[in-house]
């Protein structure tokens, strides 16, 4: 059964590496960091099925910047339920006034802002965050995240504000239409009326999709039933065939500020 699963996984996720270890299907994906701020998402579980520790998910490596404080080292900024951010920085092990003290065990580890300790933070599959790379624009580098392929049939985000960070919780691309289900969502004639999925591109812009009400043309004079309730790329009047990429994050813009966004596992589907 596991061999069948890994074969299916490899076929679906051609851009991600996989192997079979013990009873687990494990893999990895890489993301290129080429700018200061990049939206990323965790696509794996720990090998025992639990959430991945932040230290194991993003160990210090080439291209990453350590620092004395949150304003000097690379950051991982995770949005909280109230719309704020929980911020971790990559420590150089120094602390105290002017970095007068040093803790070798802290050097190259992620620390919660305001603390001088190795953070004990778990990142569940689908956790989406900003990665702030101090040298990203001048010295691009690659982050590799490895772990176990999730076996849950779906993962759901709760929407309680206008803008929520979302990301694919699986190491395979998920069809935006058919692979993502929403409740409490608003359809509209244009991108300014319907709910949005805004996926960050490599150049720092966004591919923006809106939930269509099926209408198009001047003043919504035409109607396509097959488009009603489907995601459409901004500027188009067709149900998109695009997929949500692995390892990248996106903004979900909710007009009602309530509802859910559910990603369906393409491996177990």
Predicted feature residues:
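Residue-level detector of intrinsically disordered terminal segments
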Residues: 4-5, 112, 199, 233
